[in-house]
Amino acid sequence: MEGPAFSKPLKDKINPWGPLIVLGILIRAGVSVQHDSPHQVFNVTWRVTNLMTGQTANATSLLGTMTDAFPKLYFDLCDLIGDDWDETGLGCRTPGGRKRARTFDFYVCPGHTVPTGCGGPREGYCGKWGCETTGQAYWKPSSSWDLISLKRRNTPQNQGPCYDSSAVSSDIKGATPGGRCNPLVLEFTDAGKKASWDGPKVWGLRLYRSTGTDPVTRFSLTRQVLNIGPRVPIGPNPVITDQLPPSRPVQIMLPRPPQPPPPGAASIVPETAPPSQQPGTGDRLLNLVDGAYQALNLTSPDKTQECWLCLVAGPPYYEGVAVLGTYSNHTSAPANCSVASQHKLTLSEVTGQGLCVGAVPKTHQALCNTTQKTSDGSYYLAAPAGTIWACNTGLTPCLSTTVLDLTTDYCVLVELWPKVTYHSPGYVYGQFERKTKYKREPVSLTLALLLGGLTMGGIAAGVGTGTTALVATKQFEQLQAAIHTDLGALEKSVSALEKSLTSLSEVVLQNRRGLDLLFLKEGGLCAALKEECCFYADHTGVVRDSMAKLRERLNQRQKLFESGQGWFEGLFNRSPWFTTLISTIMGPLIILLLILLFGPCILNRLVQFVKDRISVVQALVLTQQYHQLKSIDPEEVESRE
């Protein structure tokens, strides 16, 4: 600043109503985050750049959420000054210059929103007193709304650290790489952690000198967020591309014993395996059914003697079982909290009672057996193996306590099971034969009802010898891998639907699961039962050609039914035309037979009835011609005489 223009500031002259600073840049990979889970973990990089030289003063990367990834940033004042600072001759080119920089106070002014009178880049946005919001000076510049604070750390008193250890002899005590003897620390305030980082932000920094012009430098702070997810192309529908038929089962070849190389032969470097490709529609859904079968066969072999496992065509495609478990605390995000394991899908069906975290509303407290209160601090709660946190914002393997403290988010620890229904063979065959009628629809058994609670302690039943939990088996790992693959495909379809800029027909085509199951049904891989796509399974595994298996079983049942019939019933079954002929002439024949049997008797009775009526009529006619004589009593005649 120009000394004659105005006097040096006093502590009570600082204007507390300075401009609001918004700092940082959020670099996203082309995907909107408005629907992402607040617990989603990203690779966040904060970068402090000297705008005068273009050099990076600090680049700090960490795994964290958008709510708690605000670390302390450490760098040196000379990283912001450079070798030469303005035309004053100050700078950090020499140890003396670096030592002299320790004697000056400094103050910082925001450059993103510059109030009237604070100047521009040339003035470092500090054109007048009251524009500064932080720094290290005797009047202690600060603000209650600023997003950062920039202060000195413990500054060494001796001159040794100001010498560059790579450019001087080893007899200089305390020499440091680059001669760093002006350490600074940048911290985010509460306002900064709640702010919206929507672009690169710049500050001006000036050294406070009692006389003359205060030298100026500028620096920026940016935030980069990497691995947020795959880019979604704008163009033709991306859903149909991976609807590939299932691959043939690979025959397992027994490994051959290694043969010793011939003498004098050069060693052969084995070829690396090609990178694995994402499974197509057929393989992905068959892997899901096969994983469900493997887990069911391991825990309940009696249920897999012969059964049908069906995928539902309509949502929900997954259901959760609330469980009690012991989560682990981590001060930093563990590896399993990566973006690949985050899902913004909502779990609409949760049963049971389990462990809850956060502010659970009354409408969902029935799912909570225990509600855990989080302690103060910023750390991560990692779900135990085989489970996941089902939150009102999506599915996540890890929770950020910072998010829970700042929001009304709540989560339940659940086991995640695909919506695979279990049907007995009799029910399926009866539906296709249409011979069995039910007064009410039988209750559908799902994988969650059959296996729910088997991965956690207490309810965790032993498998095999009774000492191995289901979560530790290869069968369960196979099911979990299939679940994550299918969830990724569903989420990709949802994202494509959200970003679709094409016609309505393409939007309708992106009913992903319905398309997938239709694809399998048309290929004969599954049997369509109402709203389900069913696969046949027995102790040999899941049959891929389920329609052929269904036809085979129906033919066997038909032959067994025919073998139990008599020759007369078999005659009708073997001659369809005879059945039609008999049903056509049977009515008239029965009527004719009844006439022949009962006709004469009825006719005789009718004739006799007619004769009786005629005789009565004749008698009446004859009596009309005569008069009845009065009868005389003989005794009365004698008495008269």
UniProtKB/Swiss-Prot annotation:
* Signal peptide segment: 1-32
Q: Which cysteines are joined by disulfide bonds?
A: C109-C126, C118-C131, C307-C310, C307-C534, C337-C391, C356-C368, C398-C411, C526-C533
Q: Which residues are exposed on the Cytoplasmic face of the membrane?
A: 603-641
Q: Which stretch carries the motif YXXL motif?
A: 626-629
> What segment(s) does the record annotate as region Fusion peptide?
443-463
| UniProt cross-references to Gene3D superfamilies, sorted A to Z | 1.10.287.210, ENV polyprotein, receptor-binding domain
- Residues marked Cleavage (site): R440, E441
Q: Membrane side Extracellular: which residues?
A: 33-581
Query: What keywords does the record list, in alphabetical order?
Result: Cell membrane, Cleavage on pair of basic residues, Coiled coil, Disulfide bond, Glycoprotein, Lipoprotein, Membrane, Metal-binding, Palmitate, Signal, Transmembrane, Transmembrane helix, Viral envelope protein, Virion, Zinc
Q: Which residues form a coiled coil?
A: 471-520, 530-566
InterPro entries tied to this protein: FMuLV_rcpt-bd (IPR008981), TLV/ENV_coat_polyprotein (IPR018154)
Q: Transmembrane residues, as ranges?
A: 582-602
**Residue positions of S-palmitoyl cysteine lipidation?**
C601
Q: How is it modified after translation?
A: Specific enzymatic cleavages in vivo yield mature proteins. Envelope glycoproteins are synthesized as an inactive precursor that is N-glycosylated and processed likely by host cell furin or by a furin-like protease in the Golgi to yield the mature SU and TM proteins. The cleavage site between SU and TM requires the minimal sequence [KR]-X-[KR]-R. The R-peptide is released from the C-terminus of the cytoplasmic tail of the TM protein upon particle formation as a result of proteolytic cleavage by the viral protease. Cleavage of this peptide is required for TM to become fusogenic.
Where, by residue number, is the motif CXXC?
Answer: 307-310
Q: Where do the record's glycosylation annotations fall on this chain?
A: N43, N58, N297, N336, N369
Motif CX6CC: where in chain:
526-534
Per the record, the domain comment is: The YXXL motif is involved in determining the exact site of viral release at the surface of infected mononuclear cells and promotes endocytosis.
* Subunit and partners: The mature envelope protein (Env) consists of a trimer of SU-TM heterodimers attached by a labile interchain disulfide bond.
Described purpose of this protein according to its UniProt entry: The surface protein (SU) attaches the virus to the host cell by binding to its receptor. This interaction triggers the refolding of the transmembrane protein (TM) and is thought to activate its fusogenic potential by unmasking its fusion peptide. Fusion occurs at the host cell plasma membrane.
What's the protein name? MLV-related proviral Env polyprotein
Q: Which organism is it from?
A: Mus musculus
